[in-house]
Amino acid sequence: MYKRRRHILLATMFLVMSSMAWSQTASYKNPELNFEQRAADLVSRMTLEEKVSQMQNVAPAIPRLGIPAYDWWNEGLHGVARAGQATVFPQAIGLAATFDTALMHQVATAISDEARAKYNDFQRQGMHARYEGLTFWSPNINIFRDPRWGRGQETYGEDPFLTARMGIAFVQGMQGDDPKYRKLDATAKHFAVHSGPESERHRFDVHPSERDLHETYLPAFQALVQEGKVDAVMGAYNRVDGASASANPRLLQDILRKQWGFDGYTVSDCDAVEDIYKHHNIVPTAEQAAALAVKSGMDLNCGNTYAALTQAVHDGLLAESDIDHALTQLMTARFRLGMFDPPQLVPWSRLPYSVNQSPQHDALARRAADESIVLLKNNGLLPLSPDVHRIAVIGPTADDVAPLLGNYHGTPKSPVTILQGVRAAAPHAEVVYAHGADLVEGIKGGTQHPAEAREEALRAAKNADIVIFVGGLTADLEGEEMDVDYPGFAGGDRTDLRLPASQEQLLEALQATGKPVVLVLTTGSALAVDWAQQHVPAILLAWYPGQRGGTAVADALFGRTNPAGRLPITFYKADEKLPPFDDYRMEGRTYRYFKGEPLYPFGFGLSYTRFAYSDLQLDRNQAAAGDRIKVTLKVKNAGECAGDEVVQLYLQPLHEPHARVNRELRGFRRVHLQPGEEQSVSFDISPAVDLKYYDDAQHAYAVDPGSYRVQIGASSADIRLTKDFVVTPQ
């Protein structure tokens, strides 16, 4: 007891003495003051030139004020990227396919643990370069409105609601839960109407309708700001209604800050401020572009155009107070990250470097890959028998690390390719591998002549009991503004949704051998595999599944896991005439507005078991807009093996004049059920939130009184239960 009192006394004396010491020093050095006060004090002590230097992503040290050098640019889309070894989780589109927000939070927590641990180690070594910081430019919550967009793989799909829920979970996992200090900063990008074409992103001007803007392009950003409390928002390259998205007062001030109450900081996409005068030709000089961006609400410039701000102030293009306001936002963020406080005050400073690539994170990467895999077709071929004797694994993405990773990835310590996964899962089988075909015409996949590679693959298939064809895409073909020009691909985007011809031809030849074929697809976007759907007995969609992707695919093939991923995008048929890629109108796009029959609908995914739905109940069949409606139902595993089901709730307006969408996702639950097990699932509907539409006449959101339908299903096209209710007039 005496020792405990003595320790308490010493701690109290330390706090009192520290408080006295802090009161005698500069305000910005006092951790007892709030971060905004400290940031404002620090900014007030800088010269104009020093202020300007801190508003570019490469911010130099200011030794006289104790400010260390810092580079704001860091990437963490599905793992810490470009900073050495780090756990690589499935690409973002694959994480979205899990329909599992709790898992997403765990993944983001693991990413941020590794990021903070790396930062701690970099600090000990005095390192302050790019990819060594705490401000991460993820997640990408743009809407994957068109399957041709190469960066769609970075998103959470085509649906605003799913994107919002997965994005919130990611942000909260990244930023941590300490009441004072952030673990790191997440950044919602690219605000707000941005989804290709990649080759035109520095030049094109988007003119979305107000309905599309407020019902499709803005909701996820609003959710991440207001519910997720995201610390940063990144502007896009393109123009929106004539103004650069990175210098757009309506987006950055009126909507983001005034309407939504955003109190974080904004950052331009890299060299987007330069685009203002070099490519958009909005103003003629760097000084005018920099001044326009700052005055429009852009705090941080990724690039160096803000170097012109000093001259811009001297020329009267903006006031130094405009600089002060923006920089105070930025320095507040650095204080909140603990960059100016003793490490013992910042709980995240104790994260050890050993968390990187830890066994726990590796296991989580495997689980995430397991949950992301989508079973698209199964005519009873899967799961494969463990007693199979001879397996032919064929295809250009079977024994390659690239299709595991997608873009914006780190360096995994021990990645498992799909071929390696199959060999490990079938140790007693003879597993023969053949590359078989080039990824696409123009990319050579080995030393063999294409005809020789094809013949080798066919020989392997004819001698096998089962053929596993692994093909699709890699991030060498689809991604961000790439120097790519191959059949079906241009500039990072796709010009053809079909499987590359070299692969399609080999797949058809393999099927013609008469041996059972499983098609495993690696991709970050929809593939129009119409022929395979008609002829191949089993199709498994792996996405870009991360470092343990090969293990996860093999587990699904052999039934060690039961695939339960669901499509976060629509897969269109090969002959579907899509709207022009550069047309941002939502009419005819995504499951919400598409009137045709898709190859695979949004939310689709098969299982090795069967699920039965029953007993849908609403606690009221009439409600005012401000009320809440509780929805309950039961789901039962009616099959013979355990599995996950993703229960999906859609709402459909039944009345005119605003029967505007086919249906909209407004809830989902991933539940695990043993054979014969039944579980109750519940949702809450808030008409004011879940049924609102944007009223052009009122320039505001509204809820129409009238009839609506609750639809419970296993996908957007597989509705099992329905019940109607009425929203009464206010």
Residue ranges and their predicted role:
Residues D718-Q730:
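Short beta-strand elements
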Residues L10-S19:
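Bacterial N-terminal signal peptides
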Residues H699:
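Extracellular/periplasmic metallocenter environments
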Residues Y2, W22-Y693, A702-S716:
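Glycoside hydrolase catalytic-domain context in secreted enzymes
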Residues M1-L10:
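Bacterial N-terminal signal peptides that target proteins for export
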